[in-house]
Every structure is written in structure tokens, then in C-alpha cells.
């Protein structure tokens, strides 16, 4: 893949099947296709049922069933990316697949930076670590993080992606 193809990549929002190990399988396959998948993940300690003072660490998706994908549709056609059984579809706004504002993804990467949880997006996570968020951007992302119900976080994400300029994110999509 040459540098021109790397420069023409955009972030898109897509959905995946959450059953079993589908996320890991899909992300591994997308990495093989030279596409960068990423979703905000966190680890939480869950008390074990068989012991009073033991915990397990579990990985949870902030937006279950949703992920961001960095791709150039001239190189990786949409139909080729939809081939994996865990890939549901791209999120459409106004009936079409639209790029997500890069600042939104960078802001989320700044808040959820763990490269161990997302090894395929290591370069993008490193780049996002040096950005600065405005007060409005940070407050909206913090509001999403503090929302307990995943369904509510997903609706806040969809609102943010469709109306980025109303939440402090400048429209900079080509």
C-alpha cells in the first residue's frame, strides 16, 4: 500500500455482532485487510462467584456492537469489508455511509488510550495522545463516559457523529 492510499483513509462508524469472540475475530481479519478497526474498551474487575476476595478482569466495549474503521474505499471496497460474518454494516446517516469527524475518534482515543486492548490501532492511539481537547469536547466525551447504560452511550455517540459541530467538533471532513 503506498502513501497516497494511506492519506485518503477516513474513519467510519460500523456495527459488529457482539456474540462470543466476534470482535476479536473481526478486528484480526480487518487488520489483515490493511484496515484499522478500533473501539473504545475498558477493563473492569468483576467479583468471582466462587470466592469472596478474588476478582476477574473483564474487557467491556464502551459502545457494544459499534466500532470505528479507518479505510480507503477506493482500495478496500465496502462489499469486501462486509464479507466477514461478524460485520453487520456501516452506520448510515441520511441513507449513506459518511465519514466520521477525525477529531471525534481522536478525542475518544485520548480518553481510552490503552494500546494493549487495541493492538491494531497502536499508531493512531499514539498520534491521538498528543492532541488537546477543547472544554466543550471534553465535557461531551466525559458525559458519554459517565452514562451508565450502554444504550444511552450509543445514542450519545450517534448524536455526536451526526451533529459534531454542535458539540465543539469542527467539521473537517473532505
Positions of the model-derived regions?
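Acidic-enriched and Gly/Ser
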Residues: 2-174
Amino acid at each position: 500500500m503506498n502513501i497516497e492510499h494511506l492519506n485518503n483513509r477516513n474513519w467510519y462508524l460500523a456495527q459488529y455482532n457482539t456474540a462470543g469472540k466476534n470482535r476479536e475475530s473481526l478486528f484480526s481479519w480487518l487488520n489483515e485487510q490493511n484496515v484499522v478497526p478500533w473501539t473504545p474498551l475498558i477493563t473492569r474487575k468483576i467479583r468471582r462467584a466462587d470466592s469472596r476476595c478474588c476478582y476477574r478482569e473483564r474487557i467491556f466495549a464502551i459502545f457494544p456492537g459499534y466500532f470505528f474503521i479507518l479505510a480507503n474505499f477506493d482500495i478496500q471496497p465496502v462489499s469486501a469489508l462486509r464479507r466477514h460474518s461478524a460485520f453487520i454494516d456501516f452506520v448510515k446517516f441520511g441513507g449513506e455511509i459518511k465519514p466520521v469527524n477525525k477529531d471525534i475518534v481522536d478525542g475518544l482515543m485520548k480518553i481510552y488510550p490503552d494500546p494493549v486492548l487495541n493492538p491494531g490501532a497502536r499508531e493512531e492511539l499514539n498520534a491521538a495522545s498528543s492532541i488537546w481537547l477543547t472544554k466543550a469536547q471534553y465535557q461531551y466525551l466525559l458525559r458519554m463516559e459517565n452514562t451508565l447504560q450502554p444504550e444511552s452511550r450509543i445514542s450519545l455517540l450517534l448524536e455526536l457523529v451526526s451533529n459534531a459541530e454542535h458539540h465543539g467538533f469542527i467539521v473537517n471532513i473532505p
